Regions:
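Flexible, acidic/Gly-rich N-terminal and inter-domain linker regions that tether
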Residues: 10-127
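Canonical Radical SAM [4Fe-4S] cluster-binding loop centered on the CxxxCxxC motif
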Residues: 122-159
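Conserved alpha-helical substructure of the radical SAM core
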Residues: 147-177
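Conserved AdoMet/S-adenosylmethionine-binding subsite of the radical SAM
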Residues: 168-177, 182-237
Length: 237
């Protein structure tokens, strides 16, 4: 099956630990897709256009962790999705809760075995989540432990936004503010950061205002200028 260039060619093969990474490179990460891309992908898989909206809602409004939870999608097409796509879902490994103010620190594992951290901070005005944007970091800031082992890789948009989804489900409350200030330099993962912002602020999804998003940087000036040209209403810190 040939997919347009910003999709991966789909190849079916048996799943096992040895070829897990190969398989995941062959499957399409649909949680990182915007609505237009998902619609085109679903049509290419032989389904009607309206299915894309249903699936997008399951992913970005109801925050399901598996295709099997999509109860208004036929079992036949669920299998097609499993054969051709992956639904990124972070695994919650540990939660530490501060006795002082109730701040919750999360340790999540990724599909490739790497781990990242996120933090939930509860305020009177709402719930704020601090997310990671990379596994490791190459900026070399002496005060930051994230850079000790260097950069492993940037997070996919799906891995960035699923930190918010998983924390929201864990506490059973809406997340109102997001800070990209965890592990990694967000502007060093620029394209994925922009897609994350698009998904985060989409009115068809979780719909968090750009004004409630803060991106922290150590000061990558060319990227800061590029971000300014995007004319977003986010806060750069």
């Amino acid at each position: 099956m040939t997919i347009r260039k910003n999709y991966r060619t789909i190849i079916k093969c048996e799943f096992n630990k040895e070829n897990m990474e190969q398989i995941k490179e062959q499957l399409t990460d649909i949680k990182s897709m915007n609505m237009d891309e998902l619609t085109e992908f679903i049509i290419l898989l032989g389904e009607k256009k309206f299915r894309a909206k249903q699936i997008y809602e399951w992913i970005h409004v109801k925050h399901v962790d598996s295709f099997d939870e999509m109860t208004n999608i036929s079992k036949k097409f669920i299998q097609v999705l499993k054969d051709n796509a992956m639904l990124i879902s972070l695994k919650k490994e540990q939660v530490q809760v501060s006795k002082l103010d109730g701040t919750r620190k999360y340790l999540f594992s990724l599909d490739d075995g790497n781990v990242i951290e996120s933090v939930l901070m509860k305020y009177k005005h709402g719930n704020s989540v601090c997310i990671s944007s990379q596994v490791g970091c190459r900026m070399g800031c002496r005060f930051c432990a994230s850079t000790l082992d260097g950069l492993v890789r940037g997070l996919r948009p799906s891995e960035m936004i699923d930190q918010i989804y998983q924390i929201g489900k864990d506490i059973g409350e809406r997340i109102s503010n997001v800070v990209v200030m965890g592990t990694g330099e967000p502007l060093d993962n620029y394209d994925n950061l922009l897609r994350f912002i698009e998904l985060l602020t989409d009115e068809n999804g979780i719909n968090i205002s750009q004004r409630n998003l803060t991106v922290s940087t150590c000061g990558l000036v060319p990227r800061m200028r590029q971000l300014a040209d995007e004319k977003l209403s986010i806060t750069l810190a």
